[in-house]
Amino acid sequence: MSGVEEPIILLGRNDIEKLLSRHLRAGLIGFRRFRDCGVVEGQEHIVAERRTIVIDPVTRIEGHSKITLHLNEEGQVYDAQFHVTQFRGFEKFCEGRPFSEMPALMARICGICPVSHLIASAKACDALLAVRIPPTADKLRRIFGLAQVVQSHALSLFHLSSPDILLGMDADPAKSNIFGVLEKNPQLAKDGIALRKFGQQIIERLGGKRIHPAWVVPGGVSDPLTADDRDAILKTIPDALAIAERSIVWLKGTIEGFRQEIASFGNFPTLFMGIVKPDGGLTFYDGKIRFVDASGTLVAKDLDPADYQEFLGEKVEPWSYLKSTYYKPKGYSEGVYRVGPLARLNVADRCGTPRADQELAEFQELQRTAVLSSFHYHHARLIEILYCIERMESLLNDPEILDKHVRAIAKANALEGVGAAEAPRGTLFHHYKIDEQGLIRWANLVIATGQNNLAMNKSVLQVAKHYVKGEKITHGMLNRVEAVIRAYDPCLSCSTHAAGKMAMQIQLLSPDGAVLDEVVRN
């Protein structure tokens, strides 16, 4: 118990039935908490007469969170905070475990992007072994990671964000889901399902199962690719490419109707960070860290991911379990940077595959500088899907891809190792220290969502300032706040190293801290 006494509100049975009936019809599923005063009906939510109204949660993202909006005397938003309220702390679970268990254990952090944790963890273990994995194992790991990017991006765009883009930000909340998309544009919904299935089936063929595979191990992978599995995957490539290309056409033709959102959805100068190849090309597996600023000017290049603590700082705010990561040379307030699809396309010179490079050239024409609006994360995801499919096809046709030598066996030869890779949501770091017996004595994870945390907070503030007027939360305002968070595709289980579905609470606070309006959804 927290020791804080919850106020008791007495409502008549008719009032309760009336409120529940209205909001179940509106599709706002969950419970409501009323406190501090009587309750009356609002237009699309429950409004407290003097202080409180509650929505719970932000929908169509992963994890549990809360948003607080602070109002000045004129009723205008002057500050906003995105709180992550779930906690588990996977690093502490690791202590005392053999380092060889880390990849399979770390994959359990997340059910959406387990492969990213598997790869980053295995790379950290490779550093502990001080081995260079066999070339075929390197290529197979790359295919594995690319397949996960496809399935995760498909989930984010088609299942979670396409209702906003296809149906509009002010659509009936009861229809703002994949079923509403299926009703209005059946082909789009089917394409999203097919792309995710495509990625998941590759993961299953390589790793043995779709969720939490343990195929990537210290020193390489556990089993080689068979000719039958290679051929089966290659047969699915043409359809996947066709879906990716027509999805890009659909998105480019649709986002013209979202000029206001493009202008206000996280559209501000920040740094951008990502891993690139030695030639500056896009990569998800291995390379050096690069930073560019909002003008597209190179800020730092050829940074070794193993030295991340030299250029990245982390800070914990009292209002969130999610760490905020910043670029150390510029400090906490000025070192805001973004990672993920938008950042990767801003820092890369090229994708390195024909179709994706053509789309990247068009994408870069959206602004003369770096592309700043976080609304364009959606566009960037589709370009990356196209790149991943093209790159997998190339790797699967490599003459060495069926080689049987896929693992280097060694004992620990170092007491510290760092592994880094590009997860769907951005750069991921795993850092382990072991004792002489090979047991983990310390672990640190730097997650993409944490690296986007400062930018997400600024984005919520920008959207709220643009759309929140007065002391009531409307559906359109709420959905736009949710939508800008969905653009970043945060994985809150990863960021707090916890498991759970997305729940959200939004509060409007007066200058004296009183809750004016609150919405809670589960």
Feature map (PLM): residue ranges:
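Aromatic-rich beta-strand edge motifs centered on tyrosine
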Residues: K433-I434
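N-terminal basic, low-structured, amphipathic or hydrophobic segments
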Residues: L10, D15, L19-R22, G27, ...
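Active-site bordering "gate/hinge" segments
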Residues: E41-T427, I447-N522
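Extreme N-terminal basic, low-complexity initiation segments
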Residues: M1-G12
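Intrinsic disorder/low-complexity segments enriched in polar/small residues
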Residues: E6-P7, K18-L19, G42-H45
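Active-site catalytic microenvironments in core metabolic enzymes, especially phosphate/sugar-handling
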Residues: G438
